[in-house]
Amino acid sequence: MSEMVDTTQTTTEKKLTQSDIRGVFLRSNLFQGSWNFERMQALGFCFSMVPAIRRLYPENNEARKQAIRRHLEFFNTQPFVAAPILGVTLALEEQRANGAEIDDGAINGIKVGLMGPLAGVGDPIFWGTVRPVFAALGAGIAMSGSLLGPLLFFILFNLVRLATRYYGVAYGYSKGIDIVKDMGGGFLQKLTEGASILGLFVMGALVNKWTHVNIPLVVSRITDQTGKEHVTTVQTILDQLMPGLVPLLLTFACMWLLRKKVNPLWIIVGFFVIGIAGYACGLLGL
């Protein structure tokens, strides 16, 4: 009598740990460290992926070499919002290491497909809204002579930056390929519009608070029965009509000049010249 013995080959599922994800997050802070004109952020992306590649692919294995080469392809996006792309790539690499039929083209296709739309969101949110608003808050405090101003800007901006990077990687990894659905349906456009509206609202309030323009040209002088003289200036009339009108017009003028591609340095110099000349001629006051 012969005895049949069934043998089954078991393989251990390869799984990224929280330590690996934290390692990717920490390395992503050096994302721009090796930026170059040929492949932009490719080296930074590959450097960030190293902890995951070490976990998923054995040392001195062809699969590890392919993974390294795979992430040296051209990549360029806003550096903070590269985090969810890193997270999605982690999920895809994990599935591939466990035998899923995911080729190089699929992984790079997801990266290329996400880096453009996310760059369109990251630039207006971080460079056009978050940084100017925090800088304005810090500058307002610094104008009073307090060191808290620049410290506040540094702390707030980096809190947002680090939170975006960490939770972006974690979110992208947890969602995997499904993140593409979340990016659809006009979500990115609504997010960008909302951030832009909030930024414009805050900057509008700051313009009225911190921009001071005085036009002391006298319109009339009236002496009352007690002999007290009442002077009406152009600035008095403007404040009665709409407080902060001149600073608002100056802001619109700056926006128009910037859209015409005028160098911001020349705009600043122009304001200096107008202010000095206007004060010398008596058109502007302190």
UniProtKB/Swiss-Prot annotation:
The record, for InterPro entries, names: GatZ_KbaZ_carbometab, PTS_IID_man
Q: What GO biological process terms are annotated to this protein in UniProt?
A: phosphoenolpyruvate-dependent sugar phosphotransferase system
One Pfam family this sequence matches: EIID-AGA
Residues forming the PTS EIID domain are: 14-284
Q: Which residues carry this modification: N-formylmethionine?
A: 1
Record key words, sorted: Cell inner membrane, Cell membrane, Formylation, Membrane, Phosphotransferase system, Sugar transport, Transmembrane, Transmembrane helix, Transport
Q: How does it assemble?
A: Homotrimer of protomers that are composed of two subunits, IIC and IID.
Please describe what this protein does: The phosphoenolpyruvate-dependent sugar phosphotransferase system (sugar PTS), a major carbohydrate active transport system, catalyzes the phosphorylation of incoming sugar substrates concomitantly with their translocation across the cell membrane. The enzyme II ManXYZ PTS system is involved in mannose transport.
Q: What is this protein called?
A: PTS system mannose-specific EIID component
Q: Which organism is it from?
A: Escherichia coli O6:H1 (strain CFT073 / ATCC 700928 / UPEC)
Q: Which taxonomic lineage does the organism of this UniProt entry have?
A: Bacteria, Pseudomonadati, Pseudomonadota, Gammaproteobacteria, Enterobacterales
Q: Which gene encodes it?
A: manZ
